[in-house]
From Swiss-Prot:
Disulfide bonds: none
Protein name according to UniProt: Anthrone oxygenase ptaC
Signal peptide residues on this chain, from the entry's feature table: 1-19
Biological or metabolic pathway of the protein: Secondary metabolite biosynthesis
Organism of provenance: Pestalotiopsis fici (strain W106-1 / CGMCC3.15140)
InterPro entries documented for this protein: Anthrone_oxy
GO molecular-function term, one example from the UniProt record: monooxygenase activity
Gene name per UniProt: ptaC
Keywords: Membrane, Monooxygenase, Oxidoreductase, Signal, Transmembrane, Transmembrane helix
TM stretches of this protein: 33-53, 64-84
Length: 141
């Protein structure tokens, strides 16, 4: 998940001069990310649940893994409530001025500001599964 904020978004910011094109590039990155990241998160959650069920059936401690699973999935409400407004603003700008009457294309400064905000929020979102892994590893040691 950190590849996007550490490499992809800085590359977009370095190469984009047209605000609509820059927003469209972000929208393409989002398109591929949304097809990859949620299945990975769901798979991770299923693995946590499977391990929790195994441990419970063997009367072993499982609470820490449950905390790790919940923390990992915390990125979903974070995305819906914190990141969605920025996503929606970038999607509107990616549509360009021709998409809706009376709409003007965003300035390069506006798109850049939204991308920088999205980048910071995505880093924060990426910390949920990372924290979940750290919690799970602390249980394994």
């Amino acid at each position: 998940m950190m590849g996007l904020p550490l490499m992809a978004v800085p590359m977009l910011l370095d190469t984009g001069a047209d605000p609509v094109y820059l927003a469209r590039q972000w929208a393409r990155m989002y398109y591929y990310g949304v097809r990859t990241m949620p299945p990975l998160a769901i798979t991770t959650f299923i693995l946590y649940v499977w391990t929790i069920i195994r441990r419970r059936s063997q009367h072993q401690a499982w609470y820490i893994l449950a905390v790790a699973a919940v923390v990992t999935m915390g990125m979903i409400p974070f995305t819906w409530y914190v990141l969605a407004p920025t996503n929606n603003a970038l999607f509107r700008l990616a549509e360009g001025p021709e998409a809706a009457s009376g709409t003007t294309a965003g300035s390069l400064e506006e798109v850049t500001e939204l991308l920088v905000r999205w980048n910071k929020l995505h880093i924060a979102r990426s910390l949920f599964p990372l924290t979940g892994v750290v919690i799970a590893l602390s249980d394994a040691m």
